[in-house]
C-alpha cells in the first residue's frame, strides 16, 4: 500500500474524502479544532483529556472549573504526537488536584471549541453506589461500517439485523448518559482493519483504515468527551488487517497497535498509590506501578472498585497476537519478559478489600464463552491468579454476543453459585455492534447462565454496596432489560489469598 499522507499533511485544504474509498470526515477550516475528544481516569484526583487536531499544537491546553461560566484554571502540556499514516495529531493534558465526585466544566483551548463537562473520580473507599458500562467489540457505523446498504458482508452472522439500522449502542449510551459514571472498553474499537471486507476499499487500504478510525472516534466523542472511557487492546487494534503473517505489508503507521498507543498511551493511568494502611499493600502497589504499561496493562481505583485492565493479545506465553502467536500478527512485546504477569500479581496482591471491596478485571479474549473458542493461552496465563486473589468479576469480549456465566474455575462451576463463591463470575459483553456482525450462541456449557445474540447489546455493572454487585444486560435498540443478576460477596478478608 502506497502512503499518500506526506502530501495530505502538506495540503490539508484538499477535499479529504477524495483520498480514500472509505470517507474521511471533513477537515475543519480551523486546524486547531478539537475532534475525537476522550477523557480518562488518570489518578485519585485527576483526569486526562485527550483530543486530536489537524495540525500539531505547540502547547495543548485545557481551561476548566466548577462553573461553566468561570473556567478559572488551566492545564497545559507539550504532548502533541502523530504517526506516519495519520492525518491528525493526538494531544493530551492532565487535570490534577480535582475535588472528588464533582462536576467540572472544561474547554479545550482553541478558537473553535465548546464547553463540556465530566464527573471527577470518586476516591477509593467511597462506598456510594455507582454504575459503569462494559462496551466491547464496537465498530464504526455508516457506509464504511456494519450498516452498509446492499452489501451483505458477513451478514450471514446477523440473522435479524437490518443493515440500515443506526448505531443503536452509541445512541443508547447517549440517551442514558446520566445513568453511568464511566465506560470500560477492553478491546476492538472501530474495526478499521476490516476495510478489506468492503470491495471499494481494495485499492487504497491505507486511507480506508485511517478514514474508519477518524469516523469511529468522531462518532464516539459525544460519549467519550463526557464520560471516562477506559480502553485496553484487542486483536482489531493490532495491524491494518488480520491476514496471518502479512502485517509486514502494512504501512509503518498501521502495525503493532500504532493508533491505539498513539491515542490512549498518554491518557490511561498506571497504578494508583495505595491508600491502604497496610505496608505490604503499599509495597505491592508501588511494584505494580513500576511494572504497569498503559494502555496495555494498568489499574485504577474508583469508589468501592479496584479495576485492572489486562492485555490478552501480547506479552505472555503463546499470546495470540504476539511475535510467535497463533494469529500471525507479530504484535509486541511491549514489556520485559513476564512483566505483565508480574504486574498483574503485584497489583492483585495490593488490593485492600476494606478500601475497595470489589475487584474487577477486564480483558479482551475470554476463556469461558459460547459461540466462539475460548483463549487457552489466556486461561493458562491468567486464570490461576484470578482465583488465587479472589477476583470477583471478569469482563471480556471478542465473541460478538452477550454472555453471563456462573462463578467457575478450571471448567467447574463453584457450588456456592452467586452467594459468596470463591471462583470469579465471568461475563462477555461483545455484542455492541460492528461490521462482522453477531456470533450465534452455539452450544452452551453447563455453567452458562445467559446468552443472547438476537440484537446488539451491552452490559451495565452496578456497585450496590460492599457486598452486592449487579450485572444487567440491555438490548441496545430498545433499552429493554435482557438479563439481571446479583452477586453477593461477604468480603470479610482484608487481603484475600486462596
Please state what every model-predicted region is.
Residues 441-442:
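Periplasmic/luminal catalytic loop of GT-C fold multi-pass membrane glycosyltransferases
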Residues 25-438, 448-452, 460-498:
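Metal-dependent phosphoester/phosphodiester hydrolase catalytic core
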Residues 1-22:
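Fungal secretory targeting signals
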Amino acid at each position: 500500500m502506497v502512503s499518500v499522507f506526506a502530501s495530505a499533511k502538506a495540503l490539508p485544504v484538499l477535499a479529504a474524502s477524495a483520498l480514500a474509498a472509505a470517507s474521511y470526515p471533513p477537515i475543519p477550516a480551523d486546524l486547531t479544532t478539537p475532534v475525537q475528544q476522550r477523557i480518562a481516569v488518570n489518578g485519585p484526583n485527576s483526569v486526562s483529556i485527550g483530543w486530536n487536531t489537524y495540525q500539531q499544537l505547540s502547547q495543548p491546553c485545557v481551561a476548566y472549573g466548577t462553573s461553566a461560566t468561570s473556567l478559572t484554571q488551566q492545564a497545559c502540556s507539550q504532548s502533541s504526537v502523530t504517526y506516519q499514516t495519520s492525518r491528525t495529531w493526538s494531544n493530551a493534558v492532565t487535570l490534577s488536584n480535582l475535588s472528588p465526585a464533582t462536576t467540572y466544566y472544561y474547554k479545550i483551548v482553541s478558537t473553535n471549541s465548546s464547553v463540556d463537562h465530566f464527573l471527577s473520580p470518586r476516591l477509593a473507599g467511597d462506598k456510594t453506589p455507582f454504575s459503569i458500562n462494559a462496551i466491547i467489540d464496537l465498530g464504526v457505523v455508516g457506509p464504511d461500517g456494519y450498516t452498509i446498504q446492499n452489501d451483505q458482508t458477513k451478514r450471514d452472522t446477523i440473522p435479524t439485523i437490518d443493515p440500515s439500522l443506526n448505531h443503536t449502542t452509541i445512541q443508547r449510551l447517549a440517551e442514558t448518559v446520566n445513568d453511568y459514571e464511566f465506560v470500560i472498553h477492553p478491546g476492538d474499537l472501530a474495526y478499521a482493519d476490516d476495510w478489506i471486507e468492503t470491495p471499494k476499499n481494495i485499492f487504497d487500504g491505507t486511507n480506508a483504515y485511517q478514514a474508519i478510525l477518524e469516523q469511529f472516534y468522531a462518532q464516539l466523542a459525544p460519549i467519550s468527551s463526557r464520560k471516562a472511557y477506559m480502553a485496553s487492546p484487542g486483536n482489531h487494534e493490532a495491524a491494518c488487517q488480520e491476514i496471518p503473517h502479512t502485517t509486514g505489508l502494512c504501512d509503518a503507521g498501521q502495525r503493532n497497535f500504532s493508533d491505539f498507543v498513539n491515542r490512549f498511551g498518554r491518557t490511561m493511568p498506571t497504578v494508583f498509590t495505595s491508600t491502604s494502611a497496610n505496608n505490604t499493600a503499599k509495597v505491592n502497589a508501588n511494584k505494580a506501578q513500576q511494572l504497569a504499561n498503559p494502555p496495555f496493562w494498568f489499574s485504577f481505583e474508583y469508589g468501592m472498585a479496584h479495576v485492572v485492565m489486562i492485555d490478552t493479545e501480547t506479552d505472555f506465553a503463546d499470546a495470540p497476537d504476539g511475535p510467535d502467536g497463533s494469529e500471525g500478527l507479530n504484535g509486541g512485546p511491549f514489556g520485559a519478559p513476564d512483566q505483565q504477569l508480574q504486574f498483574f500479581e503485584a497489583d492483585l496482591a495490593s488490593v485492600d478489600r476494606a478500601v475497595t471491596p470489589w475487584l474487577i478485571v477486564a480483558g479482551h479474549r475470554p476463556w469461558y464463552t459460547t459461540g466462539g473458542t475460548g483463549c487457552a493461552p489466556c486461561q493458562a496465563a491468567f486464570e490461576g491468579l484470578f482465583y488465587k486473589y479472589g477476583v470477583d468479576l471478569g469482563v471480556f469480549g471478542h465473541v460478538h454476543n452477550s454472555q453471563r456465566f456462573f462463578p467457575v474455575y478450571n471448567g467447574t462451576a463453584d457450588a456456592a453459585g452467586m452467594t459468596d463463591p470463591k471462583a470469579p463470575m465471568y461475563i462477555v459483553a461483545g455484542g455492541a455492534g460492528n461490521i462482522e456482525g453477531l456470533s450465534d450462541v452455539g452450544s452452551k456449557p453447563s455453567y452458562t447462565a445467559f446468552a443472547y445474540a438476537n440484537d446488539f447489546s451491552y452490559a451495565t455493572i452496578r456497585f450496590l454496596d460492599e457486598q452486592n454487585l449487579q450485572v444487567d444486560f440491555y438490548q441496545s435498540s430498545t433499552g429493554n432489560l435482557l438479563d439481571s443478576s446479583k452477586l453477593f460477596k461477604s468480603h470479610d478478608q482484608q487481603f484475600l489469598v486462596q
